Amino acid sequence: MLTLADGRKDGKEFISMAPGYFPEIAPELWNDWKWQLKNRVTTLAQLEQHLVLSEEERAGVLLSGDKLALAITPHFFNLIERDNPDCPIRRQVIPRIEETWASPYDMADPCGEDSHMPVPGLVHRYPDRVLFLVTDRCASYCRYCTRSRVVSGVGEQELHTEFEAAFRYLEEHTEVRDVLLSGGDAL
């Protein structure tokens, strides 16, 4: 259940406290994005404090940490169904063992971005538009992330955007009319 935050007059701001994994948190803290980042769920112990994990989830948490970090904001965690391992939101952010399985068809760069990166952090695949990777950190890490190889600060590769070089590139390439900023998805 979503409830209006106490003291709000416009009726537009709300807090989501259901199912209530963090009932003791005051609305002013709950609505503070800095508090949300500081209090992310990042460990197996934190998950098990609130959820009964399936064997696939527990193994996934234990074995996937070197590929993509575990991080879930309290707000997003509150949307997870406690007793349903098939809850879509739960599947989005809690690792499963299948995530660690390797296939001979796996690709190091599944989006093919590296070959279209004139400077680190800027993908120029189409004539008049670029993708500017501005950060490699997100509030919560989605398990299906197409950039999981370069986000969260773990794994073999990291994103090292060269901002000044990217700005120079954009100044020199006047055909670019559309710059898509990516990375660091919202809470």
Task: Give the residues covered by each predicted segment.
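Conserved Radical SAM active-site core
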Residues: 94, 106-133, 143-187
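Flexible, acidic/Gly-rich N-terminal and inter-domain linker regions that tether
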Residues: 1-124
